[in-house]
């Protein structure tokens, strides 16, 4: 075979396309390319869609923001307008406190069709909704530094939307929230919901009319005007405080004394480690400044007639708490992770349990665990008696007797167990509701808790004030938190 010389000339051939029916080659090549691409798209997408076209799901519900699932996959919230490619499946609509709506749907072979559905959820557990919203509210009112990066949960707007077909629950939620409201931002949301449920013009900014409406609908005492003023934003508060109608009302309240009387019931049992405290009266005085130019404060008095009770003379010890754990394994240390998931404790629950001596006060417990301990202890008492956490007024009576070894403020860092869990969590100690004078009420679903540093009577400036308060969440399990029990008649 003859080898071709590498330097020989190679003749290049060039193919020239000719016009077809007068159409230039570059035009029909471009068109051919487009046709091929469209054919490919048709093969891969459009033709399958004719076999399984899908549809636009348009779903509305009587409750906004209902969660929609298709074949167990979350696809959005109502009002929903979303394209899906499923030909059939099980559609579910879920919302806390409502019965889950379920329906099997089938998409007919109609390309780019619509599938519209109106869902009406049935309310089955309003208390579950209320409990969750109260929990959120108690956390929201703790957030004081509001800025552009902080977005509060509009609790009142949410519950007004969720329970709009059941106004009695909304009205009760609003009223129950009053003692816990101490946030200008949340108060705005409160007023918006209040105006909506009581058919008041949202643009109505007449504070006197709003106050009188609140007072009438919620049966408030006149002294609740200070609760109202404290929740207004700074500028509006100053303006309203100086209004003639507020000054007139405040003058009638100075030195007003409301009596909160409970029928006394004699305690006829003795328990080891408990001290009997006789029935007595405790007077609380709260001062309010109406005008910064006026040196005179408005004083409100509340007199509590406290029933006879027994109180433990020391906090519950590790030894006592161990007995509780033996009979209640749910609260044992080896179940801590589950308790955290249920938000009943935090990671500090019984953290230093092994380091605590048997006769030392148990710490690292939460409000929830203390309540369960009290319920467990109640079962061991004679019929008609109940164990619970103390209320402030009971502590005051107990501490009237001076202690020989008061806790010095400089010793706090060395001491544990000086925070004592209390029964109630109200931010407001004044009696603000007419005809509702029960100050022994059980703690509600509100998740933040007011507790108090409880040492003994203040004798000089180096000692802690017995009524110093703090606010925290009920699942907190601080090494500084302890508790003791009260026993009283049921």
Swiss-Prot record:
Compartment list: Membrane
Membrane topology recorded in Swiss-Prot or TrEMBL: Single-pass membrane protein
Keywords, sorted A to Z: Membrane, Transmembrane, Transmembrane helix
Gene3D superfamilies associated with the record: paralog of FGE (formylglycine-generating enzyme)
CC per GO annotation: membrane
InterPro entries documented for this protein: CTDL_fold, PEGA, SUMF_dom, SUMF_sf
Pfam families (alphabetical): FGE-sulfatase, PEGA
Protein name, as recorded: Uncharacterized protein BB_0032
């Amino acid at each position: 075979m003859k080898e071709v010389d590498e330097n020989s000339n190679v003749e290049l051939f060039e193919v020239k396309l000719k016009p077809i029916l007068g159409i230039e080659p570059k035009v029909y090549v471009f068109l051919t390319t487009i046709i091929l691409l469209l054919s490919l798209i048709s093969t891969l997408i459009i033709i399958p869609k004719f076999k399984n076209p899908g549809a636009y799901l348009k779903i509305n519900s009587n409750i906004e923001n209902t969660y929609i699932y298709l074949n167990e996959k979350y696809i959005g919230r109502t009002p929903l307008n979303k394209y899906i490619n499923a030909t059939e499946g099980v559609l579910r609509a879920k919302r806390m406190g409502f019965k889950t709506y379920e329906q099997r749907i089938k998409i007919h072979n109609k390309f780019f069709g619509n599938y519209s559905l109106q869902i009406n959820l049935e309310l089955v557990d309003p208390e579950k909704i209320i409990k969750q919203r109260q929990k959120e509210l108690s956390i929201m009112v703790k957030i004081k530094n509001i800025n552009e990066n902080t977005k509060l949960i509009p609790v009142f707007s949410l519950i007004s939307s969720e329970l709009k077909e059941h106004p009695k629950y909304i009205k009760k939620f609003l009223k129950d929230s009053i003692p816990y409201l101490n946030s200008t931002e949340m108060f705005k949301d409160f007023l918006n919901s209040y105006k909506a449920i009581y058919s008041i013009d949202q643009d109505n900014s007449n504070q006197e009319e709003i106050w009188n409406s609140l007072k009438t609908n919620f049966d408030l005492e006149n002294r609740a005007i200070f609760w109202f003023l404290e929740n207004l934003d700074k500028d509006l508060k100053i303006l309203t405080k100086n209004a003639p109608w507020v000054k007139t009302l405040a003058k009638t309240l100075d030195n007003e004394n409301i009596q909160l009387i409970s029928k006394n019931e004699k305690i006829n049992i003795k328990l080891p480690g408990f001290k009997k405290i006789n029935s007595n009266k405790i007077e609380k005085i709260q001062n309010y400044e109406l005008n910064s130019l006026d040196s005179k404060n408005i004083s409100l008095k509340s007199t509590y007639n406290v029933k006879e009770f027994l109180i433990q003379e020391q906090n519950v010890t590790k030894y006592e708490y161990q007995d509780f754990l033996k009979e209640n394994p749910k609260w044992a240390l080896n179940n801590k992770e589950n308790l955290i998931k249920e938000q009943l404790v935090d990671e500090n629950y019984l953290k230093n349990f092994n380091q605590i001596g048997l006769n030392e006060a148990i710490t690292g417990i939460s409000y929830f665990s203390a309540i369960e301990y009290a319920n467990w202890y109640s079962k061991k008492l004679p019929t008609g008696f109940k164990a619970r956490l103390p209320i402030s007024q009971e502590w005051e009576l107990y501490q009237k007797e001076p202690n020989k070894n008061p806790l010095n403020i400089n010793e706090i860092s060395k001491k544990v167990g000086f925070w004592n869990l209390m029964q109630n969590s109200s931010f407001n100690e004044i009696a603000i509701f007419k005809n509702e004078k029960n100050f022994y009420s059980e703690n509600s679903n509100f998740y933040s808790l007011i507790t108090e540093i409880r040492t003994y009577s203040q004798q000089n400036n180096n000692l802690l004030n017995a009524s110093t308060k703090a606010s925290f969440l009920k699942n907190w399990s601080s090494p500084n938190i302890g508790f003791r029990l009260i026993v009283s008649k049921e």
